[in-house]
């Protein structure tokens, strides 16, 4: 088991346009936030182009989720995003992506200090659609 008690942050973003200026601003905000809170950075995963516009096909999100799940075995892990809309602009789909992060063993946190960590007393955005584990219907 790891002796490092600092959370391991997995940066995620999506960007549809060829111009990357605003993407770099968002990633720099993640870097600064992680440094301020002393989070160790696992890496950056960015879905680009059509993948960034889809809520169904996110290969970089899936790769990040696999890495996050693997690391969650012996580390505290989180997905760090610049804002909730980096997952999806649709509140329901945003909740779906957050649920997947939760099921992989992590939580989601924004560079403005909002998170969905279980038991957290930090603020949550009103636009961060809540997720719930819904039991499967009996057959």
Predicted feature residues:
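Short, structured surface patches at the beginning of a domain
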Residues: 1-139
